[in-house]
Amino acid sequence: MNFTQQLNSIGTFQGNVLLSGINSTNLNVYNGTTPGKTILWVIYNDTESSNSYPVWSGVIWNREYDSENQTLSITAQEMLSLYQRRRISDTKTYTAQDPTYVAQNLMQYTEAKSYGKTGLTYSVPSSSFSTTKTYNNYEFKSVYQAVKDLAQNFFDFAIIPYLSGGDLVNQFTIGLPLGTPYSSSDPTSAVFQFPGNVISYRFPEDGISAANRLYGLGYGANSKKLTTTAVDSAKYTDGFPLLEDAVNYIDIGDQTLLNNTTLGHLNAVSYPPTTVEIVIPTYVDPYYYTHYSIGDTVQVRINDDYFPSGLNLILRIVGMSVNPGENGPDRVTLTLTRELASGSVV
């Protein structure tokens, strides 16, 4: 079994059930795993506190039974995947509205449709931004894609399972951003060390995707096209050559929004993008689920042949893959990225 989570995206569950030796009638295996109809929950028993928590929920979309091996294979995707199958079928117009309000309203809109209610709850803060959007009824845009497009410029989002009075509930959650910042003065902030509580790690860096001067292209054509330029001049001081690139945001017609969006992109790529993967057990400090989650920033320390003088970075958790051990200990693979740079619009 394996299940994943990704920041502002959709994680996946894959698992196999051996039907040999179990009472499949009493367990209602066939009717209880119907694709497109059934929600699958993953419950984690925390060995530190002996409490149980829902750590993953999603829709079963595929199943396959192999009679030779008597094995049922199940594939599910996080609850956000359901909203890929929900369409904006009425024209919706938002003028100078908080983008977090727009996102929540779109979710509530589709939940209010006939047979659309899933019992979703909401944790949606206000932001300091505003946006103007029109979703035309003839486009039939998916609700998920509309929310994801909003998030690219303004916020993080997820559907998070939790317990409420003993009931399993899903909550649509927006963060500005999601996650808890690392603090050296907070003893609960997660620290990962190799050697130490990290079993292994991968450290790829992609210079081909780096840019320290980025041109943003917005709405319009020819001389009337909106443009902006974002620069991280600190990289030149650090010895990097000029690395230029351009990005297209043809649906952005506001100069301030184009400036902010281009700058955000630059800050993510001005240092060669680094996607670190670390493999850790669930049973050592920091403990799985209770001590770190998607969106958190954590400290990573490495001292080995590749970093003989030691490396100490603050990285953000953007992905998580959990492999519960069947014949060995549980393992968690965290995907982490560098903190954003501090460029400027010129």
Show the residue positions of the predicted features.
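Amphipathic, non-transmembrane alpha-helical segments in extracytoplasmic/periplasmic proteins
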Residues: Q6, F13-G15, A76, T91-T121, ...
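Short beta-strand-centered interaction patches in the first periplasmic/extracellular domains
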Residues: V55, V59-Y83, L120-A210
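Short, conserved beta-turn/loop elements at beta-strand boundaries and strand-helix junctions
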Residues: R63-E68, M320-N327
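Solvent-exposed coil/turn segments that connect beta secondary-structure elements
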Residues: S20, R63-Y65, Q77-S81, P177, ...
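Acidic, small/polar-enriched beta strand-loop surface segments
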Residues: Q145-K148, L178-G325, A341-V345
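Surface-exposed cap/loop segments at beta↔alpha junctions
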Residues: S24-S123, E339, G343
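Oligomerization/assembly interface segments of phage tail-like spikes and tubes
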Residues: Q5-S24, T71-L82, G216, S270-V284, ...
